[in-house]
Amino acid sequence: MTAESTRKASIERSTKETSIAVSVDLDGVGKFDITTGVGFFDHMLEQLSRHSLIDMRVMAKGDLHIDDHHTVEDTGITLGQAVAKALGERRGIVRYASLDLAMDDTLTGAAVDVSGRAFLVWNVNFTTAKIGTFDTELVREFFQAFAMNAGITLHINNHYGANNHHIAESTFKAVARVLRAALETDPRQKDAIPSTKGSLKG
């Protein structure tokens, strides 16, 4: 990529339940400006930005008087759409990445194929329904929405862990790190689409 990144995108999405605006720069430095009204979720999105080096601005207003579900899911949808738009043809990307990430008592693996084909494999179990006031089931809901709309195949496997906060946070950090690697420009094929099909449109 040139010094001035062209892999940027902004998406605004409004429904009767939420109003969300997202901007991303895939060639950023991990700067973030995130306000969703859900404190724990903000913290997780900050980890996603910081460790992927994707600059993110996420402004979300949702029906939090009901619960956090619509805000979390719709943020995943909008963020995924922004990433897909910024990727364009997905020309020159590394495409694949995987790793195991340690966080204190917890070990979580993530693998990604930025293929244009949307899929989530989720092997993560929480031992409590909530982290503070945040429903732990919403972690999966976010990644499901994000993967489907970014057009990526994403596998997340928690191998072990005792602390539910660490389990949740390790999923965001592991996904961040594989996104960082897979979205990098491959210096050996800067202008090529990394597929024998000649397309990564699904």
UniProtKB/Swiss-Prot annotation:
It is found in: Cytoplasm. InterPro entries: IGPD_sf (IPR038494), ImidazoleglycerolP_deHydtase (IPR000807), ImidazoleglycerP_deHydtase_CS (IPR020565), Ribosomal_Su5_D2-typ_SF (IPR020568). The keyword Cytoplasm applies. It catalyses: D-erythro-1-(imidazol-4-yl)glycerol 3-phosphate = 3-(imidazol-4-yl)-2-oxopropyl phosphate + H2O. Pathway: Amino-acid biosynthesis; L-histidine biosynthesis; L-histidine from 5-phospho-alpha-D-ribose 1-diphosphate: step 6/9. Coiled coil: none annotated. GO terms for cellular component: cytoplasm. Keywords: Amino-acid biosynthesis, Cytoplasm, Histidine biosynthesis, Lyase. The keyword Transmembrane helix does not apply. Pfam families: IGPD. Its main location: cytoplasm. One of its GO terms (biological process) is L-histidine biosynthetic process. GO terms for molecular function: imidazoleglycerol-phosphate dehydratase activity. Its EC number is 4.2.1.19. Belongs to the imidazoleglycerol-phosphate dehydratase family. PANTHER family: IMIDAZOLEGLYCEROL-PHOSPHATE DEHYDRATASE, IMIDAZOLEGLYCEROL-PHOSPHATE DEHYDRATASE HIS7. This is Imidazoleglycerol-phosphate dehydratase. It comes from Brucella suis (strain ATCC 23445 / NCTC 10510). The lineage of its organism: Bacteria, Pseudomonadati, Pseudomonadota, Alphaproteobacteria, Hyphomicrobiales.
